[in-house]
C-alpha cells in the first residue's frame, strides 16, 4: 500500500524500516479519540464552508460507521497502515470515496495526535480519580472499624509511640487526597486543544479552533501553534502524579508485607489475596502488595523515559514523540490495576491480629514520651524530664523490665513528683487518648477526622 507522502520519493521504504517507523501496533488504542477528533474537525470544516454541508455530513456518517464497525469487530486497524490516523482515513476513503480525502484539510497529524492523546488521557484521569475515590472508601472503612485498635507507631523503623490504627489509615487517606488534587491540576492542563495548529505554523485554511475545542470538551486552545504540537509537559506531569500515587501504594504495601510476617504478626492475609509456594507447603505469600511495590519501579521508569524523551528535541514536532504513548498507556494500565488490587486487598484480603497489637503496645517503651510529659505537667522542664526518663529507660533495660513493672518507690528514686497516678498515665489507651491536639491520634480527634472524611467522601 502506498503512503500518502510517497509521491515525493523515488523508491519504496525498506520493509524493516517501514515496520520500525510504524506506530499502528500501539496507537490504535486511540481509535475512538481519533474518530471523535475527526468528526469535530469535519463539522468545523462544514461550519466554515471549507466543505459543503453534504461533504461534511458524508464524512461524519462515514466516521460513525467506522466506529460501529470497530465495535462490532468488522474493522481492525493494523499493518500495512502506518498509524491509526492513516488507517481510519484509508477506511473512510474506501467507504465514501474521494470525499474522504478532504477530511485532512487544515490539519496535520502533528496536531491530530496531540488532540487524540489529550482526549484519551483526560478520560483516563477521570477513571483513575474514581479508582482513587474507591480506594479512599476502603481506607475509610478500615479506619472507621479500628478507632480503638492500637498499633505501635514507628520512626526510623523503631518503636516510637502508640497510635490509633484508624489514625494510621487516615494518613493514607490524606496522601491519596493530594494525589487526586494533583490529577485535577494535571487534567486542567491536559484539557487544552492543539487542534488547528497544523504541522507547526497554523494554516491559511479558514478554520475555527474554538469550535472544535468546544465540540471536544476542551476548556481552551493553545495560543501558540509551535507550542501546541511540541508540548508534552502534560504527559510528564501525568507520569509524575502517577509516580507519586504509586509511591503511596508502595508504602502501604511495604507496611502490609511487614505486618503479615511472623516477626510482626500484626495482621494476616486471607486466602482470597494470598498465594502459596511450589516447594514450601507452610507458606502464605503476600504477592499482591509485593507486585504493587514492584510495579512502582515500572511507573517511575515511564516517568524517566518521558523526561529523557523531550530533553533534547528542538521545536517543533519530532518523531521522538511517537515514543510518548507506550509509557503513558503502560502507566495508566499499571496504576489502574494496582489501585483495584489494593482496594480488594483492604476490603477482603487482610485481617488484623488485635491481640498481638494489644500485646505489642503493652510491652515496649513507646510510652516514654508520656512519662516525660507527666513530669512536665508537674512543672519539671521538658529537657530535664527527658533526661530523667532516659535514665529510667536505661535502668529498666538493665533489669529487663518495663515502666509498668516499676513500683512507685522506684519511680520516686528518679524524681519525687511521681505519684500513684503515673500508672494510669502510662496505660496505652490513655496514652493515645491524651494525644488530642488537632490532627493527633487521640480518639476524639480521630472521630472528628472520620466525620470530616465522611462528608468529603459520601456527600
Curated annotation (Swiss-Prot):
Keywords: Amino-acid biosynthesis, Arginine biosynthesis, Cytoplasm, Lyase. It is found in: Cytoplasm. Pathway: Amino-acid biosynthesis; L-arginine biosynthesis; L-arginine from L-ornithine and carbamoyl phosphate: step 3/3. It comes from the Bacteria. It catalyses: 2-(N(omega)-L-arginino)succinate = fumarate + L-arginine. Gene3D superfamilies: Fumarase/aspartase (C-terminal domain), Fumarase/aspartase (Central domain), Fumarase/aspartase (N-terminal domain). GO terms for cellular component: cytosol. Pfam families: ASL_C2, Lyase_1. GO terms for biological process: arginine biosynthetic process via ornithine; L-arginine biosynthetic process. Its EC number is 4.3.2.1. Coiled coil: none annotated. Belongs to the lyase 1 family. Argininosuccinate lyase subfamily. PANTHER family: ARGININOSUCCINATE LYASE. This is Argininosuccinate lyase. It comes from Prochlorococcus marinus (strain MIT 9515). The gene is argH.
Amino acid at each position: 500500500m502506498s503512503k500518502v507522502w510517497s509521491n515525493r520519493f523515488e523508491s519504496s521504504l525498506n520493509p524493516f524500516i517501514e515496520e520500525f517507523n510504524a506506530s499502528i501496533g500501539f496507537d490504535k488504542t486511540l481509535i475512538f479519540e481519533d474518530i471523535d477528533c475527526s468528526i469535530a474537525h469535519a463539522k468545523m470544516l462544514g461550519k466554515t464552508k471549507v466543505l459543503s454541508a453534504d461533504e461534511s455530513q458524508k464524512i461524519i456518517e462515514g466516521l460513525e460507521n467506522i466506529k460501529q464497525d470497530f465495535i462490532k469487530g468488522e474493522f481492525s486497524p493494523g499493518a500495512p497502515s502506518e498509524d491509526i490516523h492513516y488507517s481510519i482515513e484509508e477506511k473512510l476513503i474506501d467507504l465514501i470515496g474521494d470525499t474522504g480525502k478532504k477530511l485532512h484539510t487544515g490539519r496535520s497529524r502533528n496536531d491530530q495526535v496531540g488532540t487524540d492523546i489529550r482526549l484519551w488521557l483526560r478520560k483516563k484521569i477521570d477513571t483513575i480519580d474514581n479508582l482513587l475515590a474507591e480506594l479512599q472508601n476502603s481506607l475509610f472503612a478500615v479506619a472507621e472499624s479500628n478507632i480503638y485498635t492500637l498499633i505501635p507507631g514507628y520512626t526510623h523503623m523503631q518503636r516510637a509511640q502508640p497510635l490509633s490504627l484508624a489514625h494510621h489509615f487516615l494518613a493514607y487517606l490524606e496522601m491519596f487526597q493530594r494525589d487526586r488534587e494533583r490529577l485535577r491540576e494535571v487534567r486542567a492542563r491536559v484539557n487544552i486543544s492543539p487542534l488547528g495548529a497544523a504541522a507547526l505554523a497554523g494554516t491559511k485554511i479558514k478554520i475555527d479552533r474554538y469550535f472544535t475545542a468546544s465540540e471536544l470538551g476542551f476548556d481552551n486552545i493553545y495560543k501558540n501553534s509551535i507550542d501546541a504540537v511540541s508540548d508534552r509537559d502534560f504527559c510528564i506531569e501525568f507520569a509524575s502524579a502517577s509516580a507519586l500515587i504509586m509511591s503511596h501504594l508502595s508504602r502501604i504495601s511495604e507496611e502490609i508485607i511487614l505486618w503479615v510476617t511472623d516477626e510482626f504478626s500484626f495482621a494476616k492475609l486471607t486466602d482470597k489475596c494470598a498465594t502459596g509456594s511450589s516447594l514450601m507447603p507452610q507458606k502464605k505469600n503476600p504477592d499482591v502488595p509485593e507486585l504493587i511495590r514492584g510495579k512502582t519501579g515500572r511507573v517511575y521508569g515511564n516517568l524517566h523515559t518521558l523526561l529523557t524523551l523531550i530533553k533534547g528535541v528542538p521545536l517543533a514536532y519530532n518523531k521522538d514523540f511517537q515514543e510518548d504513548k507506550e509509557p503513558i498507556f503502560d502507566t495508566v494500565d499499571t496504576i489502574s490495576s494496582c489501585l483495584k488490587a489494593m482496594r480488594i486487598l483492604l476490603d477482603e484480603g487482610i485481617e488484623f491480629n488485635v491481640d498481638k497489637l494489644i500485646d505489642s503496645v503493652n510491652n515496649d517503651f513507646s510510652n516514654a514520651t508520656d512519662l516525660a510529659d507527666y513530669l512536665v505537667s508537674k512543672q519539671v522542664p521538658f529537657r530535664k524530664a527527658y533526661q530523667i526518663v532516659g535514665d529510667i529507660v536505661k535502668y529498666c533495660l538493665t533489669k529487663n523490665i518495663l515502666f509498668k513493672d516499676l513500683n512507685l518507690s522506684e519511680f520516686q528514686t528518679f524524681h519525687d513528683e511521681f505519684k500513684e497516678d503515673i500508672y494510669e498515665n502510662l496505660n496505652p489507651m490513655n496514652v493515645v487518648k491524651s494525644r488530642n491536639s488537632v490532627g493527633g491520634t487521640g480518639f476524639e480527634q480521630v472521630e472528628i477526622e472520620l466525620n470530616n472524611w465522611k462528608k468529603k467522601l459520601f456527600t
